[in-house]
Amino acid sequence: MNVLKKALVLGAVGAMLAIPGYAKVVTGSQSDANLDLKYPLVYTDHAYAQQAINTDIANYVLEAKDMYYNQHIYKVAQNYKVTYEDSQVVSILLTTYHYYAGAVHGMTNTRGLVYNKITGQRVPLYNYVKIVNAEQLDRGLRSYVLDYYTGSHTKSRIPQGWSVKYVTDNYCLRGKGNIDLVYQPYELGPYSNGTTYIGFTPQSIEYFNRMNS
């Protein structure tokens, strides 16, 4: 572990030791003139899991700092949202924004991070739903078995001329048995649609698992 990563992880762990036991996710932050990073620090009752989760998150924070300090991208920001949490798992959407000087617009990259709070390991999508190919997802959207959401998580329809090109393993939990697959801008719609999501309900999850068993 390099010095920067070690300092970041130790700082995160140290901050969490000071918070009360009822806190589950708190916000860490770092800033500079055109750098504004806000990222999750996850607290669990299992020290090893806590360190593993926050070390993994630290990698994404370090990526953002590398974009700013080493790649000299004009502006970099990061924020997050906890989409679901229970005693076993925590689901987080971590979004990194970057803007090159002179570009028409900035770009975002959103990662769904679903962690087992007991082991500290990432939980793979196939633990919840089995998907064979992109055609299944595309057909599911067009038959309304699956839902299409824009960046504000507003239900819509996949735009004309766009289709699902690949099966992503990028996902988040939404609670009540719902799961969203996460696609970046321009992957399932124009830039104005932002980050887009393919939504699975418990009913569509059962259907896909039965179909692909």
Please report, for each region that a protein language model flagged, where it lies by residue.
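Compositionally biased intrinsically disordered regions enriched in Thr/Gly
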Residues: 21-213
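Bacterial N-terminal signal peptides
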Residues: 11-18
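Bacterial N-terminal signal peptides that target proteins for export
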Residues: 1-8
